[in-house]
Design a protein with these regions (language model features):
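Coiled-coil dimerization/phosphotransfer module
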Residues: 1-149
Length: 149
């Protein structure tokens, strides 16, 4: 249980391998194809940023399976000199993005999306969701970074 709150592996094995392990668990428990790739020169990422990105990956993938009935999810992380770009793309059912609630409804629907947006906003970063019925979903996160050379 403690591991799920804050994975110790960030410090031990790094962010990328931690993501791979999380996606392995998802693959094994849901019979889904999950791919993870990185581009750019990898650098250390602040632990708050790492944890937030991991939570966004977990929530977006969970939504892809539960609501989108996706069979394949592609996660990519692009290390750029001044930002990190995370993209999560699925082949699920897709949906009308105008139907995303701005705030959580009484039945807690939309809670995961609201939490993802709030977590990214606090870093500060930007989160966008693009989707159309029948065309899957793309969640994109851009976070500015101040890496030390």
């Amino acid at each position: 249980m403690i591991y799920n709150l804050r994975p110790m592996s960030f410090d031990d094995i790094g962010f990328n391998i931690t993501v791979e392990r999380a996606l392995d668990k998802l693959r094994n428990s849901n019979n889904i194809r999950c791919n993870f790739k990185t581009s750019g020169d990898e650098y250390m990422v602040d632990s708050l940023v790492s944890l937030t990105l991991l939570r966004v990956i977990q929530e977006a993938c969970s939504n892809s399976i539960k609501h989108g009935h996706a069979k394949e999810i592609n996660v990519s992380l692009k290390y750029e000199p001044k930002s990190l770009t995370l993209t999560i793309k699925d082949d699920g059912d897709g949906f009308d993005t105008s139907a995303i609630p701005e705030f959580t409804r009484e039945d807690n629907s939309g809670f995961g999306l609201s939490m993802m947006k709030e977590r990214i906003y606090l870093l500060p970063g930007k989160l966008s969701i693009s989707s159309k019925p029948g065309e899957g979903c793309i969640v994109k996160v851009i976070i500015p970074v101040n890496k030390e050379d």
